[in-house]
Amino acid sequence: MTYTSPRRPQLFYTTAPMPCPYVAGRMERKVVTDIGGPDAERLHNRLSRAGFRRSHTIAYAPVCPSCSACVPIRVPVASFSPDRTQRRTLRRNATIEGFEVPAHATTEQFTLFQRYQFARHAEGDMAAMNFYDYRAMIEDTPIDTMMIEFRTPEDRLVCVSLIDRLDDGLSAVYSFFDPTMDARSLGSYAIMHLIAHTRRLGLPYLYLGYWIRDSAKMAYKARFQPAEILFHGAWTPLDRDRLPEEGDRGPARFPASLTE
C-alpha cells in the first residue's frame, strides 16, 4: 500500500509469516516502512503514536491475520505511582545511577549485551549478533536516539537502555542488564528511571512497545500504572479488571496524515 505526502510517497510492505517469538504456536506478520530521509523525525513521531516501533531505519507494527495479542502500551508519566513491589525495587537499587550518553556502541556494553542474551534468550536471533551487528542496532538510526547506562558506585555497568526521543515522550527501544543480578529487578528499575527522566524532560509519555498479556516476557509492562493502550486507533486507559478480548482490539492503524 502507498500513502502519498507532498514530499514523496511513503511505502509500506508486509513481511512473510514467521514463527512468533512471544506466543507459542502462532505466526507473526509485520507491516514495515523505511523512515530514513529528511522527514524521519516527523514520520517517526506520527507512526509511534499509531503503535509502530523502530528498529534501525525501519518502523514496524504487527498485522497478524489471526492474532491481535500485541497491544501498544505507554505510561502517562505525570500520573505514575509505584506500587509496593516497585518501591522496594527503587530502594534496592538506590546506589545505582543512570547516565545519559550518546547512542554509540562500546565493547563494555556489548559484553553485557552478550551475557544477557546467552542467559535470557539463548535460542533467539540476537544471541548470534556480533559487535558490528550490535553497533548497527545502536547507531543505525535516523532520529534523535540516546542511551542510559546504569552503573554501580564502583562504575560497573549493570544495565543499558536504548531510547528514542519523540515530540510527546520517550520510547524505550531495548534494554538489557546483568543476568546475575535478577534479585535487583534491573529491568523494572530501568523503566522507572525512564519514567522519571521523561518527567524531568517535561514530556508526557513513556512508550514501552507492545504489551502481551499471555507472554511471560511481555506481560510485565502492565505493572506500571496508570497505563494506556492503543485500542481501535485511540489511546485508552488500561483497566486490568476489564481487558478487551483479542478479537476486539483491531489491527494496526495508520495515521490519517503522515506529514502533519
UniProtKB/Swiss-Prot annotation:
Listed GO MF terms: arginyl-tRNA--protein transferase activity; leucyl-tRNA--protein transferase activity
**What keywords is this UniProt entry annotated with?**
Acyltransferase, Cytoplasm, Transferase
List, in alphabetical order, the GO biological process terms annotated in this UniProt record: ubiquitin-dependent protein catabolic process via the N-end rule pathway
- Give the residue ranges for region: Disordered: 241-260
Under catalytic activity, the entry for this protein gives: N-terminal L-glutamyl-[protein] + L-leucyl-tRNA(Leu) = N-terminal L-leucyl-L-glutamyl-[protein] + tRNA(Leu) + H(+); N-terminal L-aspartyl-[protein] + L-leucyl-tRNA(Leu) = N-terminal L-leucyl-L-aspartyl-[protein] + tRNA(Leu) + H(+)
Q: Where in the cell is it found?
A: Cytoplasm
Where is it mainly found? cytoplasm
Q: Which residues form a coiled coil?
A: none
Which EC numbers does the record give?
A: 2.3.2.29
Q: Name one Pfam family in it.
A: ATE_N
- Which branch of life, at top level? Bacteria
Q: Which GO terms describe its cellular component?
A: cytoplasm
The similarity annotation says: Belongs to the R-transferase family. Bpt subfamily.
Protein name, UniProt field: Aspartate/glutamate leucyltransferase
